[in-house]
């Protein structure tokens, strides 16, 4: 998205603050509290405070500023980012075996996101509502119900779209970051000694003094960079420069000031560890701060929900998830979508998590494994792109990868300590999603191969039909074909059972390209195969939704006139049965049958009028 289009650079930068930095921007609500809460065996001591502050600051510099904003964001596909995009880019110039490994890494990274997305809304909103413990301690029993109410309203408005509400996100988040900076600066001025923690030697001293415990404590430090993947995933919406500009001018200074302000407060008053963020504020500001914190966490949750919608659409379009209903909530912005099934499944999961864990401190124990796991995978995939696509020197790329992994692997390993205390949750959810995605992709491939393994040549069949035509009836018939050079099952069964053929036959294939968008000039390719047969291949990007009516419009512009209400669409509907398999493949087959039964049918998927569709069933053993 170029900054000279439609909006000015300041406007785009402000919008990026409102969407991209919601998650990482609400981390000060709980990060330092979890670091120094006593769970690691040391209390609010000067060396511990300085050590944690130094680690947080330099983690923000190295992971966010250097790794993601400077290096990873160079890897874009027509301006788009995200873990599946990175997977696609990394596999472009590699061997088939290497590509398979990279695809597995990308799918694991995407699955980790699904695991983490359940926790983000819960921990963000709960940590804000927990400000009630400071404002009115007697209301602490209302934290869980209020958190559920807030998130219920958020999930309910998803179907209406967020275009109108979204206009408020940017000014609210800008206000939030200014408040973070103001509260932190006020505390730092009162205790400037805390600025010594900017020296990275305090991080080194922390490890030397606390040894093994300091390593385990990295599991809490990583809370400061949760949401870092959003910087790369949302690159297509705002562009690289506005996201970088927002970070270095607003977000990084505000986060640094607030974390160090909390540290200054704790050095002066160790008892403030119960909630150092809210105790930074004067008494008169607690209620307004509670309100703005709740709004900021709702915005952070919205960004995550929108992110899971986008990831799901991309996975569906790339063939890793079954087709599902995707509703566009904005006529102007193709990225604003609503997926009902995903929305309500996520809502149920979030409510269960809130009721089960009851407090954001308990949830913090579940946070981090998926984030750091994705960071490791991002390092490997992005350096693969640097070597294979950008042709950087292999030794230089190796040094970059080693530098990244020297940070990522200790963070990931430290978070494994959380496995039994809550880390199993995102890991389990991620594992389920990985199984679902790999099952759909592999079983779909098996089905298509089974359907076409005994097929005749398309060209030979057309030549035979032209030479000895069956009864021809007036009108146009469109046969949906998953592959270009194979005979559609529906065509074979129509000839077998009805023994008729329309006077004009179009074989339509809708293809997803390895790009977010396809230009209208390249949308449709038309080839006349015989006097009465045409092949139409319509190409779409993975951020686009195929629409047959649009394809017909493009065909008309290219000289092949088609009228939707005068055309019959023939589609095959496969009734699947499982063949003989080992028990583990049989389980996978049963999962695929379940996914297939609940998948969105082709007429709904491609917006074809139901009264123009003729489905011909066939039984296939897989």
From Swiss-Prot:
Record field: catalytic activity: K(+)(in) + H(+)(in) = K(+)(out) + H(+)(out)
Principal location listed in the UniProt entry: membrane
Pfam families: K_trans, K_trans_C
Protein name, as recorded: Low affinity potassium transport system protein Kup
Keyword Transmembrane: yes
Annotated family: Belongs to the HAK/KUP transporter (TC 2.A.72) family.
PANTHER family: LOW AFFINITY POTASSIUM TRANSPORT SYSTEM PROTEIN KUP, OSMOTIC STRESS POTASSIUM TRANSPORTER
Signal peptide (residue range): none
Keyword Transmembrane annotated: yes
Organism: Escherichia coli O157:H7
Stretches that traverse the bilayer: 9-29, 49-69, 103-123, 137-157, 165-185, 213-233, 247-267, 276-296, 337-357, 363-383, 396-416, 419-439
Taxonomic superkingdom: Bacteria
Subcellular location: Cell inner membrane
Function in brief: Responsible for the low-affinity transport of potassium into the cell. Likely operates as a K(+):H(+) symporter.
Coiled coil segments of this chain: none
């Amino acid at each position: 998205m170029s900054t000279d289009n439609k909006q000015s650079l300041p406007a785009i930068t402000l919008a990026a603050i409102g969407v991209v930095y919601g998650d990482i921007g609400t981390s000060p609500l709980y990060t330092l509290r979890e670091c120094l809460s006593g769970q690691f065996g040391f209390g609010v001591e000067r060396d511990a405070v300085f050590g944690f502050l130094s680690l947080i600051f330099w983690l923000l510099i190295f992971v966010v500023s250097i790794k993601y904003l400077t290096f990873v964001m160079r890897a874009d596909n027509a301006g788009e980012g995200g873990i599946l995009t990175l997977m696609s880019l990394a596999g472009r110039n590699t061997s088939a075996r290497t590509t398979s490994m990279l695809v597995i890494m990308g799918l694991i990274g995407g699955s980790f996101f699904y695991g983490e997305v359940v926790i983000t809304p819960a921990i963000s909103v709960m940590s804000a509502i927990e400000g009630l413990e400071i404002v009115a301690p007697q209301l602490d029993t209302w934290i869980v119900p209020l958190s559920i109410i807030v998130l219920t309203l958020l999930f309910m408005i998803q179907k209406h779209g967020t275009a109108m509400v979204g206009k408020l996100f940017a000014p609210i988040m800008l206000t939030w970051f200014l408040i973070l900076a103001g509260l932190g600066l006020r505390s730092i001025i009162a205790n400037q000694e805390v600025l010594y923690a900017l020296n990275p030697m305090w991080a080194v001293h922390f490890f030397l003094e606390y040894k093994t415990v300091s390593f385990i404590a990295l599991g809490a430090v990583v809370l400061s960079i949760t949401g870092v993947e959003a910087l790369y995933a949302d690159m297509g919406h705002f562009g690289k420069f506005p996201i970088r500009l927002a970070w270095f001018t607003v977000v990084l200074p505000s986060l640094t000031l607030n974390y160090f302000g909390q540290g200054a407060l704790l050095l002066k008053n160790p008892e403030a560890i119960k909630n150092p963020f809210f105790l930074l504020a004067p008494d008169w500001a607690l209620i307004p701060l509670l309100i703005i914190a709740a709004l900021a966490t709702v915005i952070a949750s919205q960004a995550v929900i929108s992110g899971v919608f986008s990831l799901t659409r991309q996975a569906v379009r790339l063939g890793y998830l079954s087709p599902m209903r995707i509703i566009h909530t904005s006529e102007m912005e193709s990225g604003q979508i609503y997926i009902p099934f995903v929305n309500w499944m996520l809502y149920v999961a979030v409510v269960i998590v809130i009721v089960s864990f009851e407090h954001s401190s308990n949830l913090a124990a579940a946070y981090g494994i998926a984030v750091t796991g994705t960071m490791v995978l991002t390092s490997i995939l992005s350096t693969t792109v640097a070597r294979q696509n950008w042709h950087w020197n292999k030794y230089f790329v190796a040094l970059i990868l080693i530098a990244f992994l020297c940070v990522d692997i200790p963070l990931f390993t430290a978070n494994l300590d959380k496995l039994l205390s809550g880390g199993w949750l995102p890991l389990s959810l991620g594992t389920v999603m990985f199984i679902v995605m790999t099952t759909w992709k592999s079983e779909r491939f098996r089905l298509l191969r089974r359907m076409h393994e005994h097929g005749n040549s398309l060209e030979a069949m057309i030549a035979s039909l032209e030479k000895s035509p069956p009864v021809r009836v007036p009108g146009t018939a469109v046969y949906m074909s998953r592959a270009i050079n194979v005979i559609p099952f529906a065509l074979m069964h129509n000839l077998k059972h009805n023994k008729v053929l329309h006077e004009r036959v179009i074989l339509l294939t809708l293809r997803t390209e390895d790009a977010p968008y396809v230009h209208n000039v390249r949308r449709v390719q038309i080839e006349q195969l015989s006097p009465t047969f045409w092949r139409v291949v319509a190409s779409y990007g993975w951020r686009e939704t195929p629409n047959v009516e649009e394809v017909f419009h493009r065909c008309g512009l290219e000289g092949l006139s088609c009228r939707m209400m005068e055309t019959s669409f023939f589609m095959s509907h496969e009734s699947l049965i499982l063949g003989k398999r080992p028990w583990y493949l049989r389980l996978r087959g049963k999962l695929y049958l379940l996914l297939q039964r609940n998948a969105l049918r082709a007429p709904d998927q491609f917006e074809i009028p139901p009264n123009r569709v003729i489905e011909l069933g066939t039984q296939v053993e897989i």
